[in-house]
Amino acid sequence: DASGGVLEYSVSRDGMTLLYTVSSKTETENGVFAMNAGSRTDAPVALASGPGRYLKLTWDREQKRAAFVSDRDDAASKAPKLKAYLWERSARPAAAVAVVDASTPGMPATLAVSDKGQLSFSRDGGRLYVPTAPPAAPPKAEDDTPADEKVVADIWNYKDDLVQPMQRIRAAQERNRTFRGAY
């Protein structure tokens, strides 16, 4: 029973299919699963599983396709790269397919799939809109300077256009800004 590690779920409009993501202490149990809500005997089917994060479940308007983003193919990296996955509800076997990543033709070299924006389908379901952003910088190496010797200073000038709290808000907005890519 994976219900203890369910992070996100989505039920199709007809109520027949439940999609959910699992984040478990045992990374091999992580994944996106589909379950036939009308049957108590059918076991959940793994659309994608293994170590990594699974985020942003979304259905198209007709409830025939679903999409999500995951870093499962690069989870061991210090700065894992996300991919957008697409699942056709009628597909057999029921595996999701990676459709967009940083190397997809048409994706600018300065952008990658992001987990900051909204993953969505167009109204007619023909396009998948994927959030993209510049790749995150790799984590910095640990500094050996003791905490009591580090200097933290916030410098502000009365001629600044924005007061410091607004500067912080705008900086956070800029860090989380995404661009909409279409597949």
Write out the residue ranges for each language-model feature:
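Beta-propeller folds
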Residues: 1-183
